[in-house]
Amino acid sequence: MSKNNENQNNEKRDPLLCHWADQMANQIIREKGDLDSYTCASGITPSGTVHLGNFREIITVDLVVRALRDRGKNVRFIYSWDDYDVFRKVPANMPDPEILEKYLRYPITEVPDTTKRNENYARHHEVDIEQQLPRVGIFPEFLYQASRYRANKYVEGMKKAMQNRDVIKECLNEYRDEAHKMKPEDVYWPVAIFCGKCMKDTTEITDYDGEYGISYKCECGNCETADIRTFKGAKLGWRVDWPMRWNEEKVVFEPGGKDHISPGGSYDTAKLVSKRIYNWDAPVTMRYDFVNLKGVPGKMSSSKGKVIALPDALDVYQAEVLRYLFAGTRPNTEFAISFDMDVLKVYEDYDKTERIVYGVDKAKSDDVFNKEKRIYMLSQIDGKIPETMPYQITFRMLTTLLQIYSGDADKVIASLGDVKPEHEERLRRRIACAWFWIQHSAPDCAPDFCFALRTDGSKAALEGDMLTAVKRVRDEVLPKLDTFQQDKECQQAMYDIATEMGLDAKALFTAMYNALINKDQGPRLGNFMRIIGKDQLQKILSVY
């Protein structure tokens, strides 16, 4: 056997080698060596809602961070808010757009929060995700670039870029075709300026003294020479800022969207700038693909109002299940997060993995077991597999129980009877998700799932033999309900009544659904009646 094949087989056998995050962690260690600390980075401009597409980058880094820590490595996980970027477009999901319009071309930290909740527009979007990440077990160190630039932290990095602007120009040209390359006579400045008077970026650099002095003019009429050691309005453009910060923070891993990691994209040019200007080898990277919503094509854009953010997803998916979606999908694979009937399948898949991990279900092979175990481990909020298997009840069953008990979680848990105290918190989170899905998603995507028991004394329009048959179910089947060991016994008892009376069994079942929930169909009737219970059924059917 070749050494390569042997390594591949070992990776399948070892649970800490079979996941893509583990393979990436090994690559980082192999390429960067044994370090005192490994800095892994992520970041975004808070120009709008931080949606699930953005979250994919965050959790991709988190999974690799966990894999490194599982190898005993000290890891620093930084998340940069690029909040000194320009406010370029008014999003559709913020109030008072006419006010925001006035702040176009300002730094986004200078744009007001028109909801009046936070001190500025950028902070509004930062807070939204910062408060949610702990719910899914993600705890990065947040870096605020506006504060850092205004504190003149990057003075030397800007100076080096200005002094080597011709080299940077060559780096940028390297991946451009002839039609788009900058010409030798073209003026290029790696630094951009926010005007010291009007605060907009409507400026043009007119001179540089070779050290710290940059002269500029603004469309507002302001002209000045600024010393970047004290001036607060200078910042590097994206393609230079990114590699400058790699060196500043000593970043060894940072993924990128497929638009950045494409050949000749911003990562390729940043890699050149990082090495040639800042003498720092670019971090190991990996490409992550877009996240779609089922039925909504294309990349989600936070400049549009129709976005799904992390708290929206956590309304429907308990944290472990949401992590499972990302941990179980390779980052370079485009996938859709669904809020329709597929939600039930996602929960079923997670529960199946959980049963395999605890030996309730048997995996097809050791390789499959190791893979499922690692995905399950990475799906847990704290990264640890619970000592005992969590209480399992299907999402589908919860939707039925919750509607029977009008969303009362305490009554649902009481009806289950065998929930241990240590499992209750996790179960309650699943209950909350199931109830939200029934109230907000199911009416559109699965109306047949929605029902309400007739507890108000109302009656279905039954007559003749069908009315008699329903009464017989009440008088003959309900008294024996607690003796039935299986759902099919309840079904058979009703089928026998229909046969004896010469009725179509399906028509009797339809009549029972009408009597119970005012619908022609619903959950499987025998199981449904056993869940509702004899006393509640007797109360509903007593009006006939």
Stretch-by-stretch model annotation:
Residues 1-35, 50, 76-77, 169, ...:
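Basic, alpha-helical terminal appendages of large translation-related enzymes
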Residues 2-95, 243-266:
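N-terminal catalytic cores of NTP/NDP-binding nucleotidyl/phosphoryl-transfer enzymes
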Residues 10, 41-50, 143, 248-259, ...:
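Glycine- and acidic
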Residues 69-87, 278-295, 506, 522-544:
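Glycine-rich phosphate/pyrophosphate-binding loops
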Residues 84-101, 157-158, 298-300, 305:
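Charged, often glycine-rich, active-site loop that binds/positions anionic groups
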Residues 99-123, 128-132, 136:
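A glycine-rich helix N-cap at a beta->alpha junction
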Residues 138-310:
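Active-site cores that bind ATP or allylic diphosphates and position pyrophosphate for catalysis
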Residues 262, 267, 289-443, 517-544:
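Catalytic adenosine-cofactor/nucleotide-binding cores of aminoacyl-tRNA synthetases and other
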